[in-house]
């Protein structure tokens, strides 16, 4: 039951962060491309790499893993919104933007997971 509370707390923080980042990206870049989703996915992927690597090189408690990995990052990143936005771009006739959205989200997020891991591994 303890871990459930950590997931809930982390999830509430991740959801608020997602909301604030999405608003910021909309204000900065406008609504022509789903930059908010892209940014939360990049940030969440990087942090997932860091958390994973920290778990490999040191003891990370189950509560911290639940709080960050499942709760905060689970609420911060979103595959369903990314998928819906990509489909909407296609349906609206923006095929190049849709393909770019998919390639950039997947490619960059895999790369920043790697960067997060390397950041931790280079220090241990």
UniProtKB/Swiss-Prot annotation:
Q: Could you tell me what reaction this enzyme catalyses?
A: fluoride(in) = fluoride(out)
Which terms in the GO cellular component ontology are assigned? plasma membrane
Q: Which GO terms describe its molecular function?
A: fluoride channel activity; metal ion binding
Keyword Translocase part of the UniProt annotation: no
Arranged from A to Z, the UniProt key words for this protein are:
Cell inner membrane, Cell membrane, Ion channel, Ion transport, Membrane, Metal-binding, Sodium, Transmembrane, Transmembrane helix, Transport
This molecule's function is given as: Fluoride-specific ion channel. Important for reducing fluoride concentration in the cell, thus reducing its toxicity.
Output this protein's name. Answer: Fluoride-specific ion channel FluC
> Which classification does the entry list for the species?
Bacteria, Pseudomonadati, Pseudomonadota, Gammaproteobacteria, Alteromonadales
Name of the gene this protein is made from: fluC
